[in-house]
């Protein structure tokens, strides 16, 4: 089980990402136009003024059950440990143990 503060920190990041998504997208949209170097620097400064945790690349995928960040399967939203347990208990429909 992940520490509770790590899970809460991740929730806070997700809120910031959603809050600043449109603003960040607008600023980046103006950056793509043909601008002078000085104008590009000003736009970069605007981006840097936004909170650091509002950028999507700082988001970390976490298991919804345990909060574990490593060994994460996107399709299920679970870590490998929980995925294995749930699949053995037939709690995930359509998932079965491989045999070849």
Swiss-Prot record:
Gene3D superfamilies assigned to the protein according to its UniProt record, in alphabetical order: 1.10.287.1480
Report the PROSITE patterns cross-referenced here.
RIBOSOMAL_S14
* GO annotation, cellular component aspect: chloroplast; small ribosomal subunit
Question: Where found in the cell?
Answer: Plastid, Chloroplast
Q: Does the keyword rRNA-binding apply?
A: yes
This protein's record includes keyword ATP-binding: no
A biological-process GO annotation? translation
Q: Please, which domain of life does this record's source organism belong to?
A: Eukaryota
Say where the protein is mainly found.
plastid
Q: Which UniProt keywords apply?
A: Chloroplast, Plastid, Ribonucleoprotein, Ribosomal protein, RNA-binding, rRNA-binding
The UniProt similarity line reads:
Belongs to the universal ribosomal protein uS14 family.
Under NCBIfam families, the record lists: PRK08881.1
PANTHER family, per this entry?
30S RIBOSOMAL PROTEIN S14 (PTHR19836), SMALL RIBOSOMAL SUBUNIT PROTEIN US14M (PTHR19836:SF19)
**Task performed by this protein:** Binds 16S rRNA, required for the assembly of 30S particles.
Q: What is this protein called?
A: Small ribosomal subunit protein uS14c
Supply the source organism for this entry.
Gracilaria tenuistipitata var. liui (Red alga)
What's the gene? rps14
């Amino acid at each position: 089980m992940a520490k509770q503060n790590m899970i809460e920190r991740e929730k806070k990041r997700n809120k910031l990402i959603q809050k600043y998504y449109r603003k960040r997208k607008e600023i980046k949209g103006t950056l793509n136009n043909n601008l002078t170097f000085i104008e590009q620097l000003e736009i970069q400064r605007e981006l840097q003024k936004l909170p650091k945790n509002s950028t999507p690349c700082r988001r970390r995928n976490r298991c919804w059950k345990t909060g574990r960040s490593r060994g994460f399967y996107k399709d299920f939203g679970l870590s490998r440990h929980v995925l294995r347990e749930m699949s053995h208990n037939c709690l995930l429909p359509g998932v079965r143990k491989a045999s070849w």
